[in-house]
Each structure stands twice: as C-alpha cells, then as structure tokens.
UniProtKB/Swiss-Prot annotation:
It comes from Papio anubis. It comes from the Eukaryota. InterPro entries: Alpha-defensin, Alpha-defensin_N. There is a cross-link at C73 (Cyclopeptide (Cys-Arg) (interchain with R-65 in subunit A)). Transmembrane segments: none annotated. The gene is BTDB. Residues 24-54 are annotated as: Disordered. This is Theta defensin subunit B. Keywords: Antibiotic, Antimicrobial, Defensin, Disulfide bond, Fungicide, Signal. Forms a cyclic peptide with subunit A (BTD-1), or subunit B (BTD-2). An additional intersubunit disulfide bond is formed. The keyword 4Fe-4S does not apply.
C-alpha cells in the first residue's frame, strides 16, 4: 500500500512539473517587463523649446526641457 501511494505521488509530481515550469517562466517574463531599466531609456521622450518660439520665455525658464517616461513628465 505504501509503495502504491509513493508511486502515485511521484507520478503526480512528474505530471505537474511542466505546468509549474511554464507558470514560473510567465512570472519571470512579467517581472522583467515591469522592472525599469535600460528599456525605459529607449522609450524616453524629450522636448525642448526652440529659441524662435512665438511666446518669449523669462530668463529663468530658458533652457528647460521636459522628459517624459511612462506617463510621468519632469522638467529639467
């Protein structure tokens, strides 16, 4: 009886192993997509104001840049 239970448990472990590996691979992919890193730098957008713009800027506002990443914009 113990041998049968042991063999059944081993068979279940062998049968479920590929499913566990597939889930782990999907979880690793999702984690890699969510982590900021070098990929975010490739998606960054930068906007600068041309010198001959219609509205003049004050001296303190000249040279400002807007850098946007994933919906978050910062003035530099």
């Amino acid at each position: 009886m113990r041998t049968f239970a042991l063999l059944t448990a081993m068979l279940l472990l062998v049968a479920l192993q590929p499913q566990a590996e597939a889930r782990q691979a999907r979880a690793d992919e999702a984690a890699a997509q969510q982590q900021p890193g070098a990929d975010d730098q490739g998606m960054a957008h930068s906007f600068t104001r041309p010198e001959n713009a219609a509205l003049p800027l004050s001296e303190s506002a000249k040279g400002l840049r807007c850098v946007c990443r994933r919906g978050v914009c910062q003035l530099l």
